[in-house]
Amino acid sequence: PQSLGDCHLGGGSHVLACGDNVAADMLDWLYPERPVQESEGELRRFDQSEFAVKGLADTGYVFVPETCDAGGCPVTVALHGCQMNDEAIGDTFARYSGLNRWAEEHGQIILYPQTESSMANPQACWDWWGFAESTWQINPLHDTREGTQAKALMAMVERLQEAPDAPAEESTQEAD
């Protein structure tokens, strides 16, 4: 798109490398007091099926620095955009968003849950409009803490805070 100017490095318009480290800028703002503690880490696939709710894929990703293997690290949840799930772009968002590099330096786990496309949600978006519940509900819950996807995300975070290795299924190659 023209709005991107000359910034087309790194792929399509979903994940670009434009000389700015937006992930680090955002996380430094959110966590200004996090000390730097360099550590290697790995991007892992994990089985999301136990958190099964309408719209979630069977597999997600989690990035865990070595310093977080024993638990006790904060968790940041990174939700992909529409048409950015694993089925559409593979692990591109989880691998190249820039979040993993920051997480390695600051001892933070990054959770990349994944959605799936369906007839009700062909672009695999997160449920911001209510496709996962009855459209006839008087007080819809999809955009509250009581929504099915929000509850599943919180269950994933709680599991990771207990033991980051628990939901891990398999390791992928080292991530950026």
Can you annotate each of these PLM segments?
Residues 4, 85-89, 111-163:
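Cap/lid segment of the alpha/beta-hydrolase catalytic domain
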Residues 16-24, 28-70, 142-145:
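N-terminal cap/lid segment of alpha/beta-hydrolase-fold proteins
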Residues 1-8:
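Catalytic histidine neighborhood in serine/cysteine hydrolases
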Residues 90-108:
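Short amphipathic alpha-helix adjacent to the substrate-entry channel of hydrolases
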Residues 71-75, 105-111:
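Loop/turn elements at helix/coil->beta-strand transitions in domains of secreted/extracellular proteins
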Residues 19-26, 95, 99, 149-153:
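Stable alpha-helical elements in mature extracytoplasmic
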